[in-house]
Amino acid sequence: MSDKSIKMQAKVLKMFSTDKYELELLENKVIIKGHISGKMRIHKIRILPGDIVDVEISPHDLSNGRITYRHK
């Protein structure tokens, strides 16, 4: 995404497949859809419901995001 993307933290609510998730933003409790970034897919980083993750959201489409980091 561009440098204008919105970076937020979210909690994973549901896992639809290995790379599609339903996320709840921690700041304002909004539910969005998210997918994992390419680097996370390459390194086989697994994300489970309940995990806290960093999400980049495009200002053009606020209902979809990209998961860039999983907090330990």
Curated annotation (Swiss-Prot):
Query: Annotated Gene Ontology MF terms?
Result: ribosome binding; rRNA binding; translation initiation factor activity
Q: Which family does it belong to?
A: Belongs to the IF-1 family.
Every S1-like domain range: 1-72
What does the UniProt entry say about where the protein is found? Cytoplasm
Task: Quote the PANTHER family the UniProt record gives.
Answer: TRANSLATION INITIATION FACTOR IF-1, CHLOROPLASTIC (PTHR33370:SF1)
- Please report the name of this protein according to its UniProt entry: Translation initiation factor IF-1
Quote the PROSITE patterns the UniProt record gives: S1_IF1_TYPE
Q: What is its main location?
A: cytoplasm
Annotated Gene3D superfamilies: Nucleic acid-binding proteins (2.40.50.140)
Q: Which cysteines are joined by disulfide bonds?
A: none
Q: Which keywords does UniProt give here?
A: Cytoplasm, Initiation factor, Protein biosynthesis, RNA-binding, rRNA-binding
**The keyword Protein biosynthesis is assigned to this record:** yes
Short name of one Pfam family for this protein?
eIF-1a
InterPro entries per UniProt: NA-bd_OB-fold, RNA-binding_domain_S1_IF1, TIF_IF1
Q: How does it assemble?
A: Component of the 30S ribosomal translation pre-initiation complex which assembles on the 30S ribosome in the order IF-2 and IF-3, IF-1 and N-formylmethionyl-tRNA(fMet); mRNA recruitment can occur at any time during PIC assembly.
The record's function comment reads: One of the essential components for the initiation of protein synthesis. Stabilizes the binding of IF-2 and IF-3 on the 30S subunit to which N-formylmethionyl-tRNA(fMet) subsequently binds. Helps modulate mRNA selection, yielding the 30S pre-initiation complex (PIC). Upon addition of the 50S ribosomal subunit IF-1, IF-2 and IF-3 are released leaving the mature 70S translation initiation complex.
Can you list the GO cellular component terms from the UniProt entry? cytosol
Record keyword Secreted present: no
Give the organism the record lists: Mycoplasmopsis pulmonis (strain UAB CTIP) (Mycoplasma pulmonis)
